Amino acid sequence: MRLIRLPQVKDMTGLGRSSVYKLMAENSFPKPVTLIGRASAWVESEVIEWIEERVAERGSPS
């Protein structure tokens, strides 16, 4: 399991910080895990899965 910090999440998704946190508040994006104190990171595989779900939705009829 690999943990990634916010800059990597932003690079992977193309989202900005505020968009990531807005989606988390809506339960539409993986939540980070707390490391030490205020430091947090995301599970890379969960972020990849979220991206793959967005790609799959693109191909679904509306």
Task: Describe the role of every protein-language-model region.
Residues 40-46:
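C-terminal end-helix/capping segment
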